């Protein structure tokens, strides 16, 4: 790991072409990873199923948040067949709190495809993996390389940031052209390294066979090199070449190759893009209870929080009188509005990727059990705790119910 001055001099001396930077990055990262890999539960036994579930969970979700969910999911559903046979409510309950629930629904769809077409096994083929519901380029690359040792890249935001800095790229790293460029360069670099190491291993095996009684070499690390490389870039981007704040260039195994480090541009690369402000939506949440049970509403099958259970509500901030009127309408008992009691609950806020909800809550007590419409269902606190997957946007009100408000 050289100084900035040394790196700048190196660039002036021989100005590496980009393919050379990518090729030199492979052995450097593999060596670094062998000593600095993060200890993560899904790396202990990286079967295709384990890699698949972990990679889907890790989409747009922090590593620390995934750990407990991963262990619980595998305990409940240890293989593809068990996922294919699980009910949607059970799957959503296991996913409760992770968000982006379309992910678990796609897992269920993919599991059924795997059972129907692939004997319940993930295929050792990038193109076939790419055809499965919920699996895009990155996830297919991660599964193919980590679980099967196939020399393909897994390109996500971490990878794009790392190689934007290494190559000195000043444009928008989210552009399709840059993603394509990085993906192709990494594919060539990983393939070349893997083939080179396999050639060396084959030559070593041939030499050892000439020695009577010599053991035959088994290049286990060579076979896993593509997966180790992709995980190395993930770890580098998460712990060293970080997105916000100052990257830890002094600890980076690629600093001798890095244009941004050599030219003191790590703060400018990748280029900052202006974030659009999320719209704020005011909502009123109605926790309607008949004494022992709470009324839940099933959201539509498409759209935000598709198919999830929620507490009924309306758009806008309602007064207590308006909240009682809204509850009476939901219960189809408009004429009995005066018999309802509305109690203010704490306000709550939830941030989605594209919108923020600011919620005002009311508890509405009804004097007797009323049969709700088809999209509604009464549930006890135990059922909410153990069986019904209530969207995490309503966690404040869910927790109040479980505490017996």
Which functions belong to the PLM regions below?
Residues 27-247, 257-259:
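Catalytic cores of DNA base-excision repair glycosylases
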Residues 1-38, 44, 194-215, 219-221, ...:
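Intrinsically disordered, low-complexity, charged terminal extensions of DNA damage-control enzymes
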């Amino acid at each position: 790991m050289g100084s900035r001055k040394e790196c700048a001099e190196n660039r002036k001396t021989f100005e590496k072409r980009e393919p050379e930077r990518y090729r030199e990055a492979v052995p450097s990262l593999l060596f670094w990873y062998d000593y600095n890999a993060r200890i993560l539960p899904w790396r202990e036994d990286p079967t295709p199923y384990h890699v698949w579930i972990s990679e889907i969970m890790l989409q747009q979700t922090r590593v620390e948040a995934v750990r407990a969910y991963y262990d619980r999911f595998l305990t409940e559903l240890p293989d593809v067949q068990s996922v294919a046979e699980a009910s949607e409510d059970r799957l959503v309950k296991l996913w409760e709190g992770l968000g982006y629930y379309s992910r678990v629904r796609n897992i269920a769809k993919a599991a059924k495809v795997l059972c129907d077409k692939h004997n319940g096994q993930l295929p050792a083929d990038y193109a076939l993996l790419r055809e499965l519901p919920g699996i895009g380029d990155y996830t297919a690359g991660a599964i193919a390389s980590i679980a099967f040792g196939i020399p393909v890249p897994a390109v996500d935001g971490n990878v794009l940031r790392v190689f934007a800095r290494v190559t000195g790229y000043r444009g928008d790293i989210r552009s399709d052209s840059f993603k394509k460029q990085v993906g192709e360069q990494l594919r060539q670099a990983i393939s070349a390294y893997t083939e080179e190491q396999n050639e060396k291993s084959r030559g070593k095996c041939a030499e050892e066979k000439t020695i009577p009684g010599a053991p035959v070499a088994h290049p286990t690390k060579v076979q896993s090199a593509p997966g180790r490389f992709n995980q190395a870039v993930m770890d580098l981007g998460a712990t060293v070449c970080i997105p916000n704040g100052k990257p830890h260039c002094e600890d980076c195994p690629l600093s001798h190759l890095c244009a941004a480090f050599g030219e003191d541009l790590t703060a400018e690369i990748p280029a900052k893009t202006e974030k659009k402000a999320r719209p704020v939506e005011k909502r009123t949440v109605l926790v309607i209870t008949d004494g022992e049970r709470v009324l839940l509403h099933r959201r539509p099958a498409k759209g935000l929080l598709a198919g999830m259970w929620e507490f009924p509500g309306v758009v806008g901030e309602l007064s207590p009188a308006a909240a009682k009127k809204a509850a009476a309408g939901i219960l189809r008992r408009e004429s009995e509005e005066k018999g309802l009691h509305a109690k203010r609950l704490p306000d709550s806020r939830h941030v989605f990727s594209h919108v923020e909800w600011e919620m005002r809550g009311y508890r509405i007590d009804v004097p007797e059990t009323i049969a709700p419409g088809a999209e509604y269902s009464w549930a006890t606190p135990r059922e909410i705790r153990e069986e019904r997957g209530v969207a995490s946007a309503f966690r404040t009100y869910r927790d109040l119910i479980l505490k017996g408000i």
